[in-house]
Structure formats: structure tokens, C-alpha cells
Regions:
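Residue(s) in the substrate-gating loop at a strand-loop-helix junction
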Residues: 150
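Alpha-helical segment proximal to the catalytic Tyr-Lys
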Residues: 135, 179-183, 240
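Substrate-binding pocket helix/loop in short-chain dehydrogenase/reductase
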Residues: 106-107, 114-119, 201, 212
Length: 255
């Protein structure tokens, strides 16, 4: 069967999906018929407008879509958000922990605030959503959890010790959850994007971009859809015997 029929009418929850990779994942799932709940942080009118614009774009694909403004790093708030999503959709079959930020800097110059912010938004938020969604998936005796990690979570990166540590944590979290929840039919995996063309990477200086391209055998940056396609595979029954794995999506940069 195709991946499309596998996720058709399933309920997916994607965090941090108003833009970038998260949005691409939500759109891909929706294009295959999955209903979408997504979250993102809303601090001002522009962010609120972005959230609603993405919701309409997803809904236009012919599925049910609801957007939930909130801080994924807040444990109590996440419990309430997931409870609301479960009431609104009736089930949560797929969870993609995508909410993430960077606050780069060399370790010796890094502030405690830079460290805490990245660990909270990237790693703690993943724990928060897994903690809230797991009982639902266990009662359903099935579900797929996907953590959005990074190649730097596998290999490290100078100037990104906070980000790399948070992404390595997301990988170990996925592996541990795969072991804990596997007996009840819940799978957990991580995807590790390499150099992906997003607003986040567009800000990099040209010489750094050139340097990256030389390290990539396919000689190009990835597209957000490249990540979404692998997430679709992991969300679907095509990957029903795949759990506790890290899939690097990096054009062959790391082997």
C-alpha cells in the first residue's frame, strides 16, 4: 500500500509548525489526508497572523486543521494543550516534536540564558509532548513519535554546543521511548537534517554556505520537503518495523 493510504484520516500533531520544516511536515501529512493539529509560539500580531495563515493553507488541502498558540517548553501548558487536541480530534496517532530554536555562540562566551533557552525549547518541549501524548497512544495501542534532531546532534558542532546537546538529547529520548513504549505498539524515531534551505540557514554568510556545499556529496542543500518525505515514511505503516532509529537527511555529508 502507499504511504498515502496509511496516514489517511489519521490525526497528526506537529509542534513549531507555523513555518519552516514543521510547516513542510504538516503540509505533507495533510496532502496525504491526515488531519493536523499544530502548535507554535505566538508573541505578537505577526506571529498570530502567521499561525492562522498556515492553518488556512493546510485546511485548503481538504483536511481538518487546528492551530494552538503556546509555549512548548511549558510542561503544564503542554498538558492542557494536548488534552484540548485530544478532545478536538478524538485521537493522536502521530507526534512530531519539531519546535526548536538556535542561540549560537562559542562555549566560553555562552551565557546561561543561551544554554537554558535552547535546552528548554528543543529538548524539554519534546519530553513535554511525549509525556502528554504517550497515555493516549498507549490506550490506542499504537502511534508514531518523530523527534526532529539534527546532524549536529550526532557529530557535534563548534559554536553550537547548546543546540548540539539538545539534539543529541532528542535522539537518546527517542531511543529510550522506543524501548519503553514498543511493547504497546508505539514507535519512536529521530530524523537528523543536515544543511536545509530555510529562513534559519538563509542568514548564514556566503563563505560558510560554500564551505558546507563542498562537504555534501550531492552538492546542494536539502529542501524542507526532503525532511517531510522521511517523516511521512516514519509516520506511516511503511515503517512499521522501524523504531529507535536516527535517519540522517544530509545529502551524504555524514556517513
Amino acid at each position: 500500500s502507499s504511504a498515502a493510504s496509511d496516514v489517511y484520516k489519521r490525526q497528526a500533531l506537529v509542534t513549531g509548525a507555523a513555518r519552516g520544516i514543521g510547516k513542510a511536515v504538516a503540509m505533507k501529512f495533510a496532502s496525504e489526508g491526515a488531519n493536523i493539529a499544530f502548535t507554535d509560539l505566538v508573541l505578537n500580531d505577526d506571529m498570530a497572523a502567521g499561525l492562522e495563515a498556515t492553518r488556512k493553507e493546510i485546511e485548503a488541502l481538504g483536511v481538518t486543521c487546528r492551530a494552538y498558540a503556546g509555549n512548548a517548553a511549558d510542561f503544564e501548558e503542554t498538558q492542557k494543550t494536548v488534552k484540548q487536541i485530544h478532545e478536538d480530534f478524538g485521537s493522536i496517532d502521530i507526534l512530531v516534536n519539531n519546535a526548536g530554536i538556535t542561540k549560537d555562540g562559542l562555549m566560553l562566551r555562552m551565557s546561561e540564558a543561551q544554554w537554558d533557552a535552547v535546552l528548554n525549547v528543543n529538548l524539554k518541549s519534546a519530553f513535554n509532548f511525549i509525556h502528554a501524548c504517550s497515555p493516549i497512544m498507549l490506550r490506542q495501542r499504537g502511534g508514531s513519535i518523530i523527534n526532529m534532531a539534527s546532524v549536529v546532534g550526532v557529530h557535534g558542532n563548534a559554536g553550537q554546543c547548546n543546540y548540539a546537546a539538545s539534539k543529541a538529547g532528542m535522539i537518546a529520548l527517542a531511543k529510550s521511548i522506543a524501548q519503553e513504549l514498543g511493547p504497546k505498539g508505539v514507535r519512536a524515531n529521530a530524523v537528523a537534517p543536515g544543511f536545509i534551505e530555510t529562513a534559519m540557514t538563509a542568514q548564514l554568510p556566503e563563505e560558510i554556505r560554500k564551505d558546507w556545499m563542498q562537504k555534501i556529496p550531492l552538492r546542494r542543500g536539502g529542501q524542507t520537503e526532503d525532511i517531510a518525505n522521511v517523516c511521512l515514511f516514519l509516520a506511516s505503516d511503511l515503517s512499521s518495523y522501524v523504531s529507535g532509529q536516527v535517519i540522517q537527511i544530509d545529502g551524504g555529508m555524514n556517513m
